[in-house]
């Protein structure tokens, strides 16, 4: 089961808010999810009430192999840039490791 961390839309017309959830990549946007990780309310005026994410749980799911969608990644970057930084470093390390493996092969 491929997992994604993405936004799930709630609310009413012109008053949408979103929940950050872990879900199967094949499920619909507002379908069943595994775990709720936070919320985002773009209508809220105060910045501290606009975003809330559980950084430790996001990191847990990323370590298990879940992927971030672009919109979720941009919101997480605002509140917890260290999570995005850690994911980027992990990708760069794996790419560097693969490159050295290819060089040794040649």
UniProtKB/Swiss-Prot annotation:
KW Acyltransferase (keyword) present: no
A single Gene Ontology CC term: small ribosomal subunit
Domain of life: Bacteria
Recorded GO MF terms: structural constituent of ribosome
InterPro entries named among the record's database cross-references: Ribosomal_bS16 (IPR000307), Ribosomal_bS16_dom_sf (IPR023803)
Keywords, ordered alphabetically: Ribonucleoprotein, Ribosomal protein
Ribonucleoprotein in keyword set: yes
One GO BP annotation of this record: translation
UniProt family annotation: Belongs to the bacterial ribosomal protein bS16 family.
HAMAP family in the record: Ribosomal_bS16
Entry protein name: Small ribosomal subunit protein bS16
Species the sequence originates in: Protochlamydia amoebophila (strain UWE25)
């Amino acid at each position: 089961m491929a997992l994604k961390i993405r936004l799930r839309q709630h609310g009413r017309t012109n008053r949408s808010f979103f929940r950050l959830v872990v879900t199967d990549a094949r499920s619909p946007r507002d379908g069943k999810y595994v775990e709720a990780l936070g919320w985002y309310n773009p209508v809220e005026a105060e910045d501290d009430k606009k975003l809330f994410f559980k950084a430790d749980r996001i990191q847990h799911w990323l370590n298990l192999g879940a992927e971030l969608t672009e919109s979720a990644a941009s919101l997480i970057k605002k509140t917890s840039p260290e999570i995005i930084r850690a994911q980027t470093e992990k990708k760069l390390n794996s790419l560097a490791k693969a490159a050295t493996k290819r060089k040794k092969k040649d």
